[in-house]
Amino acid sequence: MNYELRQACDYCTTDWSGGRTTQLYIYPEDGDYATRNFAVRISSATVETEESVFTPLPGVQRELMILEGTMTICHEGGSPKSMKPFCDVDSFSGDRETKSRGKVRDFNLMTQNGACGTLVFVET
């Protein structure tokens, strides 16, 4: 098995409408989030506004876990869900309009094009 040790300066951080996002991993390696050309993307983002609207991502399955802060998230046609750090994972389709309330730092898994995955918090 091959592995690669990366440092903070190796990651790309960009702005989105509610804060900043740092891409930690993308597959395939030459994938591109901006053009939605990827099968798997892992990122960590900050939500820096009290209320935000998530970026629409048609065809992308999303898994979200809060790392810091608390958030209430609501998807189009659904009920609001309160989320606390390392307690809750929210799985949702990027096709649905998603709004949130609360300033947080989160961890995201995005999959599409036949890829799948799940976020699970393992307490040691």
Give each language-model segment a name.
Residues 1-36, 53-56, 73-107:
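A short, N-terminal "cap"/entry segment at the start of jelly-roll beta-barrel domains
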Residues 59-72, 108-112:
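Short, conserved beta-strand element in jelly-roll/cupin
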Residues 102-118:
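A short hydrophobic beta-strand segment most commonly corresponding to one strand
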Residues 27, 45-47, 57-59, 68, ...:
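Acidic/polar N-terminal loop/beta-strand segments that form early-domain functional surfaces
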Residues 36-50:
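Short, positively charged
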Residues 3-6, 43-46, 120-123:
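Short amphipathic
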Residues 27, 48, 110-114:
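Solvent-exposed residues in well-ordered beta-strands and their adjoining turns
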Residues 23-25, 41-43, 64-65, 72:
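Short, conserved beta-strand segments within well-ordered enzyme catalytic domains
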